[in-house]
Amino acid sequence: MSEITLGKYLFERLKQVNVNTVFGLPGDFNLSLLDKIYEVEGMRWAGNANELNAAYAADGYARIKGMSCIITTFGVGELSALNGIAGSYAEHVGVLHVVGVPSISAQAKQLLLHHTLGNGDFTVFHRMSANISETTAMITDIATAPAEIDRCIRTTYVTQRPVYLGLPANLVDLNVPAKLLQTPIDMSLKPNDAESEKEVIDTILALVKDAKNPVILADACCSRHDVKAETKKLIDLTQFPAFVTPMGKGSIDEQHPRYGGVYVGTLSKPEVKEAVESADLILSVGALLSDFNTGSFSYSYKTKNIVEFHSDHMKIRNATFPGVQMKFVLQKLLTTIADAAKGYKPVAVPARTPANAAVPASTPLKQEWMWNQLGNFLQEGDVVIAETGTSAFGINQTTFPNNTYGISQVLWGSIGFTTGATLGAAFAAEEIDPKKRVILFIGDGSLQLTVQEISTMIRWGLKPYLFVLNNDGYTIEKLIHGPKAQYNEIQGWDHLSLLPTFGAKDYETHRVATTGEWDKLTQDKSFNDNSKIRMIEIMLPVFDAPQNLVEQAKLTAATNAKQ
């Protein structure tokens, strides 16, 4: 076969970079393209309930496998996906957004086509996406199309940001040389400038050598930009106390003897706050300093000796080194840092949160107890997904087993995100290891935005655990403003009827209202095996919330009220 269609070329390239499931919806401008996915063995078209959920699913898949792809149709389809794409941009997640667009001739003639604004402007939606994309491409020439596809795939992966790729309907059936597939896409990072890199490393080593009370703080981009292994080795070699931010949950092993807890500024446990803020050197890996990630910007370091490791630059104290990538800096540091740190005398890390005290089995379930107890149910390798709201804050109180994947959307915070993200993560987990468990915690309010995607989970035989926290409405909003306001109320649903309503045949449902019911269920051997999809409704008091969320809500309300 000397030639293949451009559409097939796209899917072959995606398969080569380990993207095996593609998300999205069919539309008349992408139908011919979608035909080609079935020509590539090992590729799967998920077929979502709507484009927003598809974007969320692509985000969840990419967080596990490194990048993903969503395909939508021109105008109506692509715009429905943009909230999800914006979230991926904000949170550094590599999603390739492929849009089937009208033929080149139709665009040239400015035909008054459906799905347009009726003004002959076929570039308007492309322009809308540009500000939430690392780069964009609109294919117009079949001769350069393969190179453009390769560039878009590489950029998606390397930058961990969304990329927009427009494919006109008349080009996807045209042929390109098949031999192009024999040359893999270069997915490697370009080397750092040697002189700048040496200056950075020498400066860090000098700071490490002088430090008496250093700490390591792992944040979101530690996971997103693939330096988890380097960060773990950094902890092993130096024995510095290591902490995570809320967005960094899962980026380092929380069973490591040098793990000290979650740092969230003033919302941290007092001993964690003191340990981090009294440090004389902070090695901050992959920081994303958003309000909910920092306790409303309440970091209060006593030292100026802060080293920030970023994907595309380094910052040491007040000096910034553009273009110096943390991946290479960390790799080179690991060859010499043990010697620089040999004078360090390890200090004790903050004690782990003690186990819950024994209570009568009839005790009503509350969030503080539940999140602390959850660690007993989790297993090494689990994917734990926490929805914006009480779940995203409560999960900070749970100590993860090693090699746990943590997914939340602390920065973008689009409620309902995690239903779609769970679908994407479940596809990714199945491709890695069918026994890998995917566990969702979502509020009853958030679920109502994106519940349709449960039907896609059922369609594909995926087996996540769906924990629905039923506290009768939008609790996080109630805590911020309007505790009794009608706009924070929702219609109650019969959650345990949802799985059969969506057509599930092999499933389980449970309702848990007491500590005894929680322990009995989570300790059950068969329940711990991900043999079927499960929905577990957790009955909670209306205003019950993790204490750190209560405090964050006060800070957010104060910020909103400032003139």
From Swiss-Prot:
Phosphoserine, modified sites: S223, S526
Induction: Protein expression is strongly induced by high concentrations of fermentable carbon sources and under anaerobic growth conditions and is repressed by ethanol. Protein expression level is also autoregulated through an unknown mechanism.
Family: Belongs to the TPP enzyme family.
Protein name (record): Pyruvate decarboxylase isozyme 1
Keyword Lyase (UniProt): yes
Chain positions recorded as Mg(2+) binding sites: D444, N471, G473
An annotated Gene Ontology molecular function: magnesium ion binding
Organism lineage: Eukaryota, Fungi, Dikarya, Ascomycota, Saccharomycotina
Residues bearing PTM N-acetylserine: S2
Keywords: Acetylation, Allosteric enzyme, Branched-chain amino acid catabolism, Cytoplasm, Decarboxylase, Isopeptide bond, Lyase, Magnesium, Metal-binding, Methylation, Nucleus, Phenylalanine catabolism, Phosphoprotein, Thiamine pyrophosphate, Tryptophan catabolism, Ubl conjugation
Phosphothreonine: modified positions: T266, T336, T353, T522
Superkingdom of this protein's organism: Eukaryota
EC assignment: 4.1.1.-, 4.1.1.43, 4.1.1.72, 4.1.1.74
Other facts: Present with 8966 molecules/cell in log phase SD medium.
Keyword set includes Magnesium: yes
Residues involved in pyruvate 2 binding: Y157, R224
This protein's encoding gene: PDC1
Organism: Saccharomyces cerevisiae (strain ATCC 204508 / S288c)
Self-association and partners: Homotetramer.
Regulation: Allosterically activated by its substrate, pyruvate.
Modified residues (Omega-N-methylarginine): R161
Binding residues for thiamine diphosphate: T390, G413, S414, I415, G445, S446, N471, D472, G473, Y474, T475, I476
Changes after translation: Cleavage of N-terminal methionine and N-terminal acetylation by NAT1/ARD1.
Gene3D superfamilies noted in UniProt: 3.40.50.970, TPP-binding domain
Annotated pyruvate 1 binding sites: D28, H115, E477
Pfam families with a match to the protein in the record: TPP_enzyme_C, TPP_enzyme_M, TPP_enzyme_N
CDD domains, per the entry: TPP_PDC_IPDC, TPP_PYR_PDC_IPDC_like
Biotechnology: Fusel oils and acyloins are important flavor and aroma compounds in yeast-fermented products contributing to the quality of beverages and food, e.g. fusel oils in whiskey, contrary to common believe, seem to alleviate hangover. In general they are desirable at low concentrations, whereas high concentrations may spoil the product. By adjusting growth conditions and substrate their production is sought to be influenced. Due to their broad substrate tolerance pyruvate decarboxylases are important biocatalysts for chemoenzymatic syntheses, both by fermentation and in vitro, e.g.
Major subcellular location class: cytoplasm
